[in-house]
A protein has these predicted regions:
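RNase H-like, metal-dependent ribonuclease domains
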Residues: 1-253
């Protein structure tokens, strides 16, 4: 934007803003696009127990999380989810992870999928801690609002509410993410209580497992590097053409 402000008139920048999104390589035919070199994300969802409860169900405090790596473009970004369950003695009694189906395309959707997977195995009286505020708000808003046809996450929210069933909304609590041990003293959760060290460790373990799950269908490093270099080259060429065109248009005939 700084380059545009220095070299292009305001009227031209306003016109260009309408077309700023997209793939320059494809839309401007500057270079052959490399999209075909990127393997697609996993089509179907996966579920893997790391610590499996004896009968497939658990009772405890649930920490669910979703992870998205290599974004922000959908071409490279891949999602993973996980949950960890602690008992009253703060021991991990259950944990699982996996990837969501390919129609779940963002972090709030992945977070909702993670909570759904945990709820499928949770016994009554479990409390869930989620570090995604939109996901928690969708739970508290209820199915009528969060599953409306005009909501982009209606499909995954509908599954989430069906699985939570009669779980009290106050049993799904927001908590801040990515804190370190020792930062609990002045930080509160969504229920007004102070964050605890087990809260931080439970969330951190879920985050680690979710990131590990992304590796199941992550785009290979060399492909990511090639796409990055290609995008930088195309952007540089597009900027050069824009500057040359501006200078040419300012010349007197």
């Amino acid at each position: 934007e700084g380059e545009r402000a220095a070299h292009a008139p305001m009227a031209m920048r306003q016109r260009a803003a309408r077309f700023a999104e997209g793939n320059l390589a494809f839309e401007r035919a500057l270079h052959p696009a490399l999209d075909h070199t990127v393997p697609p994300p996993a089509k179907t969802a996966t579920f893997t127990w790391h610590i499996a409860p004896a009968d497939g169900h658990f009772l405890g405090r649930v920490y669910s999380d979703g992870s998205r790596l290599d974004g922000p473009t959908p071409l490279l970004a891949r999602n993973g989810w996980a949950f960890v369950v602690l008992d009253d003695d703060d021991h991990i009694i259950a944990s699982a992870s996996g990837v969501p189906p390919d129609w779940v395309e963002d972090i709030p959707g992945t977070e909702a999928w993670a909570l759904t997977q945990a709820a499928m195995h949770a016994l009554p009286l479990c409390t869930s801690f989620v570090d995604c505020d939109p996901c928690v708000k969708a739970v508290h808003a209820g199915p009528e609002l969060s599953c409306a046809d005009n909501k982009p996450l209606a499909r995954v929210h509908r599954l989430m509410h069906l699985t939570l069933d009669d779980t009290p909304r106050q049993a799904v609590i927001w908590m801040p993410a990515h804190l370190r041990p020792g930062q609990c003293g002045a930080v509160t959760r969504g229920d007004g209580f102070l964050l605890t060290e087990p809260d931080i460790s439970g969330n951190a373990e879920a985050d680690k497992l979710a990131k590990r799950a992304v590796e199941l269908h992550r785009v290979p490093l060399r492909t990511r590097q090639a796409i990055k270099a290609h995008d930088e080259l195309v952007t540089a060429n597009a900027m050069w053409i824009a500057r040359a065109s501006l200078i040419a248009n300012q010349q007197c005939e």
